[in-house]
Amino acid sequence: MDIKSVCFFFGGIRFLILNNVQETESLAALLKDVQTRREAFPDLVKRYQRPVYGVVRKMVISHDDADDIVQDVFVKVWHNIDKFKGESSLFTWIYRIATNECLQFLRKKRNRQWLGGDVSEELAEKLVSDNFIDGDEVQMKLQKAILTLPDKQRLVFNLRYFEELSYEEIAAITDTSVGSLKASLHHATRKIEEFLQE
């Protein structure tokens, strides 16, 4: 079984956020206007909270940590909405904030565990204890393999295979070139395949 079929089997669902581009653009316009921002913000949270939670949860595994990070993401969105220039989609901008928050959280976690335990091992333990996976052995092995990847590589892998984002979308979110992404994804896929064959 190859990685693509395992990922598909895992049930990676991309939420159809951008199903109505005009609606998204009008929401962005309402958020930029100081007078309508307070009314529009709950719509933004309603639209993006679930998919942002999915991305964050795949990175930090723990439900409680994911909830905290998602809350921080939307606080940052609220405080920085004036900085949204519309050069990318609202989706991309919010996902960039979310992925940066995840990477920062994991970096801090590693720094706190200096000389001590392995963060990947801790996440693997949470994978089992936090009911992240609904029991299937293949899914569990895949998730453990993904946890062996460096954080940014794991993020790219998750965005590509589970969120089913295009290379261009991932490049915009991670501020990386498409060529670098493809190379990173190739290495990640090879590492995961090796882990699954053990």
Per-region residue spans from a language model:
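Arg/Lys-rich amphipathic alpha helix in sigma70-family domain 2
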Residues: 83-85, 96-116, 193
